[in-house]
Curated annotation (Swiss-Prot):
UniProt name for this protein: Glycerol kinase
InterPro entries documented for this protein: ATPase_NBD, Carb_kinase_FGGY, Carb_kinase_FGGY_CS, FGGY_C, FGGY_N, Glycerol_kin
Binding site for ADP: 14, 18, 268, 311, 412, 416
SUPFAM superfamilies: Actin-like ATPase domain
Chain residues that bind ATP: 14-16, 268, 311, 315, 412
UniProtKB keywords: ATP-binding, Glycerol metabolism, Kinase, Nucleotide-binding, Phosphoprotein, Transferase
UniProt signal peptide: none
EC number: 2.7.1.30
Record pathway: Polyol metabolism; glycerol degradation via glycerol kinase pathway; sn-glycerol 3-phosphate from glycerol: step 1/1
Oligomer and partners: Homotetramer and homodimer (in equilibrium).
One term under GO cellular component: cytosol
C-alpha cells in the first residue's frame, strides 16, 4: 500500500494556493490550502507579493504530505494550474521580483489599454491573439512594470530580467531557476502571443516595446518541463509535467474534449469556455478566442466569456455588506425571498467583462422599493451571476451557430443549489454539476499524469468522469424572457451611468 503512486496538483488561485494529491481513480486523497494577502495600493488596483505566493505554495505542498501520509517519492508527477494573466517580473540572478505581481483583476493599466485602442490596434491584436485589448491581460501589466520601476526597461533589454505568469514563476522556483517556461493556455492570455502561428508576436512586442529576452519558452500542456530541485520537494526530484491556466485546466478536468462541449467555473469570477476544436474561430461578438489546450502534437482552440465578478459577489455580501456570515447562507436567504424578482444587481465592481467589455462601468442596483428586504437583495445578487452567464451562452450560440444542450459546471459557487436551479431556468438548458468540483486541479493532474504514463490516454480519463447532479429547467418561457429583459435593461442603464460626466 505504502508504495502506491499519486499525482500532485498545485492550484495557485487568486486568493489562495492549494496542493491536492490525487489517486489513479481521480479521487482526492488530501489537500492543503493557504490564503495570502491581497494588496490594494489604490482604488481599482490589485496586487500580490510573488514571494508570498511562492511561500504559500511551499506551505501547502508540506500540508498535503502531512495530511495524507504520502511520501514525496510516491508522487509520480506534478501538475500546475494557476490564476491567469497575473504578471511577475523578476531579477534573473537574485530571483527577486522587481515589483508586486499585478493581478488579472487590476485596472491600473486601463489607461495603457485605452491608448492602444485609440492608436487603432484593436483589430490587429484581435486577429493575432484572439483577445480584446483590455487591462485584464498581461501585456499592459508588463509594460506598466517596465515603465514604473527604475531602470527596468534597460535591464530587460540587457537580459537581466524575466517575465512570467504565475505558472512560469512557480516552475522557475520549483526547478531552482532551471526552467523558464509557460504553456499554450497561459501564453494565449498574455496578449503577446500569436495563437495562430503559435509564437510570441514580434510586431506586438515592438508596439509595446517589450524585449523578447524576458519571455519564457512556450510548451505544450502535457510534457516534462523540468524536475523539482530536491531541496524544494523534500529530497524528491519529481517531474513537473502538466500545466494549464485555471480555466483551461477546468475544461480538461471536465473532460470537454469534443468540439461544442462547454464548461463554466463559478470561482471568484465566472469563466465559460467552449471547445471549438482544431480550427481557430474569431468571435464576432466580443468573446475571446483562446487556446484550450495543446496535447499530443495538436492544439485545440476555445471560445471564452469572462465574467469578472461571480463568487466574489457573494464574498461582497459577506465582507462588504455583512448581510451573510458565510457563503452557503446566501442560498437560505435567497429561498426566503418572496418578491417577484424585480430587483436587479449589476455587480460591475471592476467593470463589465464579456460581451460588454466596459471597464468604466461600476456596480449598480435597480428596482428597489420600500418593501425590498435583505433576502431580496441577496437573491438578486445570486441571480446576477446567472444572468451574466446567460449573456455569454447566448453570444456563444450566435458565434458558433450551435445550440448548446448542456452546461458542465464546477467551482465553489456551483455548490449553491438555488443558483444552479436558477441558472438552468434562465438558460433553458440542463446544468450538469461535476461530482468532483475540483475540476481545475484535476485537469492539471490529468495533464501531468498523461505525460508520464500514469494514465494511458484520454479514453482512460473518460471513465473517471461522473456527473454529480443534473439541474433541469422548470421556468416557463415567457417568465424566463421577461426576467432576462429586465436584466438587459439594468445593464444598459449601468453603462449609461458610466458615461455621464460631471
Amino acid at each position: 500500500m505504502s508504495q502506491e503512486k499519486y499525482i500532485m496538483a498545485i492550484d495557485q488561485g487568486t486568493t489562495s494556493s492549494r496542493a491536492i494529491i490525487f489517486n489513479k481513480k481521480g479521487e482526492k486523497v488530501s489537500s492543503s490550502q493557504k490564503e495570502f494577502t491581497q494588496i490594494f495600493p489604490q482604488a481599482g488596483w490589485v496586487e500580490h507579493n510573488a514571494n508570498e505566493i511562492w511561500n504559500s505554495v511551499q506551505s501547502v505542498i508540506a500540508g498535503a504530505f502531512i495530511e495524507s501520509g504520502v511520501k514525496p517519492n510516491q508522487i509520480e508527477a506534478i501538475g500546475i494550474t494557476n490564476q491567469r494573466e497575473t504578471t511577475v517580473v523578476w531579477d534573473k540572478k537574485t530571483g527577486l521580483p522587481i515589483y508586486n505581481a499585478i493581478v488579472w483583476q487590476s485596472r491600473q493599466t486601463a489607461p495603457l489599454a485605452e491608448q492602444l485602442k485609440s492608436q487603432g490596434y484593436v483589430e490587429k491584436f484581435h486577429e493575432k491573439t484572439g483577445l480584446i485589448i483590455d487591462a485584464y491581460f498581461s501585456a499592459t501589466k508588463v509594460r506598466w512594470i517596465l515603465d514604473h520601476v527604475e531602470d527596468a526597461q534597460e535591464r530587460a533589454e540587457k537580459g537581466e530580467l524575466l517575465f512570467g505568469t504565475i505558472d512560469t514563476w512557480l516552475v522557475w522556483k520549483l526547478t531552482d531557476g532551471a526552467a523558464h517556461v509557460t504553456d499554450y493556455s497561459n501564453a494565449a492570455r498574455t496578449m503577446l502571443y500569436n495563437i495562430k502561428e503559435l509564437k510570441w508576436d514580434d510586431e506586438i512586442l515592438e508596439i509595446l516595446n517589450i524585449p523578447k529576452a524576458i519571455l519564457p519558452e512556450v510548451r505544450s500542456n502535457s510534457e516534462i518541463y523540468g524536475k523539482t530541485a530536491p531541496f524544494h520537494f523534500y529530497g524528491g526530484e519529481v517531474p513537473i509535467s502538466g500545466m494549464a491556466g485555471d480555466q483551461q485546466a477546468a475544461l480538461f478536468g471536465q473532460l470537454a474534449f469534443e468540439p461544442g462541449m462547454v464548461k463554466n467555473t463559478y470561482g471568484t469570477g465566472s469563466f465559460i469556455i467552449m471547445n471549438t476544436g482544431e480550427e481557430m474561430q474569431l468571435s464576432e461578438n466580443n468573446l475571446l478566442t483562446t487556446i484550450g489546450y495543446g496535447i499530443n502534437g495538436k492544439v485545440y482552440y476555445a471560445l471564452e466569456g469572462s465574467i469578472f465578478i461571480a463568487g466574489s459577489a457573494i464574498q461582497w455580501l459577506r465582507d462588504g455588506l455583512r448581510m451573510v456570515e458565510n457563503s452557503p447562507e446566501s442560498e437560505k436567504y435567497a429561498r426566503d425571498s418572496h418578491n417577484n424578482d424585480e430587483v436587479y444587481v449589476v455587480p460591475a465592481f471592476t467593470g463589465l467583462g464579456a460581451p460588454y467589455w466596459n471597464q468604466n462601468a461600476r456596480g449598480s442596483v435597480f428596482g428597489l422599493t420600500r418593501g425590498t428586504s435583505k433576502e431580496d437583495f441577496i437573491k438578486a445578487t445570486l441571480q446576477s451571476i446567472a444572468y451574466q452567464v446567460r449573456d455569454i451562452i447566448d453570444t456563444m450560440q450566435v458565434d458558433t451557430q450551435t445550440a448548446i444542450q448542456v452546461l458542465k459546471v464546477d467551482g465553489g459557487a456551483a455548490m449553491n443549489n438555488f443558483l444552479m436551479q436558477f441558472q438552468a431556468d434562465i438558460l433553458g438548458i440542463d446544468i450538469a454539476r461535476a461530482k468532483n468540483l475540483e475540476t481545475t486541479a484535476l485537469g492539471a493532474a490529468f495533464l501531468a499524469g498523461l505525460s508520464v504514463g500514469y494514465w494511458k490516454d484520454l479514453d482512460e480519463l473518460k471513465l473517471l468522469n461522473e456527473t454529480g447532479e443534473l439541474f433541469e429547467p422548470s421556468m416557463n418561457e415567457s417568465r424566463k424572457e421577461q426576467l432576462y429583459k429586465g436584466w438587459k435593461k439594468a445593464v444598459k442603464a449601468t453603462q449609461v451611468f458610466a458615461e455621464v460626466d460631471d
